[in-house]
From Swiss-Prot:
PANTHER family: INTEGRAL MEMBRANE PROTEIN, INTEGRAL MEMBRANE PROTEIN-RELATED. Its main location: membrane. The chain crosses the membrane at residues 9-29, 50-70, 77-97, 107-127, 160-180. It is a multi-pass membrane protein. Keywords: Cell membrane, Membrane, Transmembrane, Transmembrane helix. It comes from the Bacteria. It is found in: Cell membrane. InterPro entries: YczE/YyaS-like. This is Uncharacterized membrane protein YczE. The keyword Membrane applies. The gene is yczE. The keyword Cell inner membrane does not apply. GO terms for cellular component: plasma membrane.
Length: 215
């Protein structure tokens, strides 16, 4: 049980780092347009100050509160950590990543960022330690409606896209691609991550059982 928990937390933190790095890459490739949620956070940053990461935390806290009220359950510790750490990691990567000077570089970096976002979400959600604010809402809607997770994700992304556009956020062709492709990638990354985690847990459990007892 202890070994399984360690593996789950490893997947969780690895997923958060992958996700945050992907977000920062899409921001660096903003010549194409920023991903919907980050365009929304970026527009808030433009209007009211603070940082993109700080607005990610604030909006996440509001969503966690709404989801908790709807389900009448306290959020998992993983959801709370996600709410804070994603914002911190985004600001960290935004600080250390060099600015791009070419359009070709923006395309490459943005494309890689979209893939990492989709897989980052799949990896940390597979740990079962509490999805982040936005993904908790996604899973709640999926559970209550029975709709495909890809379409739920796309619907949320498109809704936020229009909100960001209305606030003058950096919307472009890349924003539309992110809204569509993230849900598609998640459809594959989530079951793949669950399968990989279960395999790692089974291997670790078998290794522990096979090891000689300590006297």
């Amino acid at each position: 049980m202890k070994q399984e928990l360690v593996l789950r937390w490893t997947f969780y933190f690895a997923g958060l780092i992958i996700l945050a790095f992907g977000v920062s890459l899409t921001i660096e490739g903003k010549a194409l347009g920023i991903s919907p949620w980050d365009a929304f956070h970026y527009s808030l940053f433009q209007h009211f100050g603070l940082t993109v990461g700080q607005w990610s935390i604030i909006i996440g806290a509001l969503i966690v509160g709404f989801t908790s009220l709807f389900t009448r359950a306290w959020p998992k510790i993983g959801a709370l950590l996600n709410m804070v750490l994603i914002g911190v990691f985004i600001d960290f990567f935004n600080f250390i990543l060099p600015a791009l000077s070419t359009y070709t570089g923006s395309i490459i970096v943005f494309s890689l960022g979209v893939v990492l976002i989709g897989y980052g979400v799949g990896v940390y959600v597979s740990a079962g330690l509490g999805a982040g604010p936005r993904d908790s809402l996604m899973m709640l809607i999926t559970e209550k409606t029975g709709w495909n997770v890809q379409w739920v994700r796309n619907g949320m992304e498109l809704t936020i896209l229009f909100a960001a556009w209305g606030m003058g956020g950096p919307i472009g062709f890349g924003t539309i691609l992110t809204a569509i492709l993230t849900g598609l990638i998640l459809r594959f990354s989530l079951p793949q991550s669950i399968q990989l985690l279960n395999y790692a847990v089974a291997r670790r459990t078998a290794a522990v059982k096979a090891s000689p007892p300590v006297h």
